[in-house]
């Protein structure tokens, strides 16, 4: 029996994150200051049911685990008001000169109609001497944000942590990974 040759790809760093709104006219928010991304599978766990006669196993019924999507955590190094608004569900106001003028969160006690978006995460492929030889793009569709947690401490920079939920439609893949030679411009 021949051994199967496997491809090994050394990956490092969060090179870039894009949040692309799923609207008639999509908006792309590029986050180049994100320093940590975590993707955790959201799973419907299967079950096992046994048919036993005392110490003898007669039969089993099994259902497999099913992936329903991913829960993503994005840590950013700076505050980006439009990204904060997209994730939290409120409205960010920017003046004519691009200056941040304010943010209003969603109304307390009411259902928030958050805009769905696709998340593209780019990470670097490295070689033996540390050079970047390419990128991998991880894509999760139909994401929605959750209410933001805010923690501000003396002596530390504010670093927002966003929690996102990706829930693909029936028949869609929960994740796609695409190799790229370079980052998009």
Task: Enumerate the predicted regions with their spans.
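Residue-level signal for secondary-structure boundary sites
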Residues: 80-83, 127-129, 148, 170-173
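Mixed-charge, glycine-accented linear interaction segment located at domain edges/termini
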Residues: 135-185
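Basic/polar low-complexity intrinsically disordered segments
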Residues: 28-30, 112, 172
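Extracellular-facing segments of soluble proteins and assemblies that are Gly/Ser/Thr-biased and enriched
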Residues: 65-120
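Exposed beta-sheet edge/beta-hairpin loop segments within beta-rich domains
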Residues: 63-65, 106-111, 127-131, 149-158
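Solvent-exposed edge beta-strands and adjacent loop segments
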Residues: 2-89, 142-156
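Extended, acidic-biased charged interface segments
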Residues: 113-137, 169
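Short, structured patches in soluble enzyme cores that scaffold and shape functional sites
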Residues: 76-78, 123, 164-168
